[in-house]
Amino acid sequence: MWATLPLLCAGAWLLGVPVCGAAELCVNSLEKFHFKSWMSKHRKTYSTEEYHHRLQTFASNWRKINAHNNGNHTFKMALNQFSDMSFAEIKHKYLWSEPQNCSATKSNYLRGTGPYPPSVDWRKKGNFVSPVKNQGACGSCWTFSTTGALESAIAIATGKMLSLAEQQLVDCAQDFNNHGCQGGLPSQAFEYILYNKGIMGEDTYPYQGKDGYCKFQPGKAIGFVKDVANITIYDEEAMVEAVALYNPVSFAFEVTQDFMMYRTGIYSSTSCHKTPDKVNHAVLAVGYGEKNGIPYWIVKNSWGPQWGMNGYFLIERGKNMCGLAACASYPIPLV
């Protein structure tokens, strides 16, 4: 009997720790301590049965984080608000469940030949990037990418920073092939705002984080789109030009498991796809640069300021990493 025990479990038994089941991780006292600290920090409570399940998941994620950080990678991982969840749960709650494919989107962006500045960060140019928001357990990232890009475009054009209503896009933009909490594309959301003749502000159409019925009031619209610039598929250099010369750019990419626990550094992955049919998360490129010979994008996420680098991340630039150059666009505001 004892010979069949996994080595880790056998060690735990010898130390007097309860022996775990064959299908379970043997969670050690250090992992339990970190889990309880994490629960306190994130104000989590569970039933007895769920506690055991979440502890197992947390310990598995904890070990993946440590293994990654002990390896040779360009980014670090850390515990965050997702650390008690499996990637299957995260995909269901936070990423697109309705497949999106922007390959049919007609490009209309005409780019020049450069040269462009070696680095750009719209956050440092002035009040041109709105604060990081939190989409919650709804696959509405596309709405935050959309509002973030339009908020920046309006601020660049007028000097006035607005906070636009993601919930309006969740509730009202279905006719433009968007699906609320199940997914959508910024390019299609920009088209909705253009033809709908506006988007309301966050204060008059507050975010709920769930699908609802459309409550748009045209007289309260404060953000308007004159045109949409759709960047040619896979033309990452055109994205550089657009960010350098005009505006932060919305894009979509494929999130895989290691991205969820991102903390700092330049993210890259060998497990993601690079095609438009696999993208599952939309974000906003607010700048770019290079570090230690690795070019990167500076990207605003919508998982709150406690995730990543105060709500931002860096991702390797120039390789269409995880399909990031497949679905890029930005709005031209009507001001």
From Swiss-Prot:
Q: What is the species of this protein?
A: Homo sapiens (Human)
Location in or out of the cell? Lysosome
State whether it acts alone or in a complex, and with which partners, per the record.
Composed of a mini chain and a large chain. The large chain may be split into heavy and light chain. All chains are held together by disulfide bonds.
User: Between which residues do disulfide bridges form?
Assistant: C102-C327, C138-C181, C172-C214, C272-C322
Show which residues constitute the signal peptide: 1-22
**What PANTHER family does UniProt report for this protein, alphabetically?**
CYSTEINE PROTEASE FAMILY C1-RELATED (PTHR12411)
Protein name, per record: Pro-cathepsin H
**Gene Ontology molecular function terms on file:** aminopeptidase activity; cysteine-type endopeptidase activator activity involved in apoptotic process; cysteine-type endopeptidase activity; cysteine-type peptidase activity; endopeptidase activity; HLA-A specific activating MHC class I receptor activity; identical protein binding; kininogen binding
Reactions this protein catalyses: Hydrolysis of proteins, acting as an aminopeptidase (notably, cleaving Arg-|-Xaa bonds) as well as an endopeptidase
Q: Which Pfam families match?
A: Inhibitor_I29, Peptidase_C1
Protein EC: 3.4.22.16
What does the protein in this record do? Important for the overall degradation of proteins in lysosomes.
Q: Which residues are glycosylated?
A: N101, N230
Primary enzyme class: hydrolase
Recall the taxonomic lineage recorded for the source organism: Eukaryota, Metazoa, Chordata, Craniata, Vertebrata
Sorted alphabetically, the keyword list is: Disulfide bond, Glycoprotein, Hydrolase, Lysosome, Protease, Signal, Thiol protease, Zymogen
Gene symbol of the encoding locus: CTSH
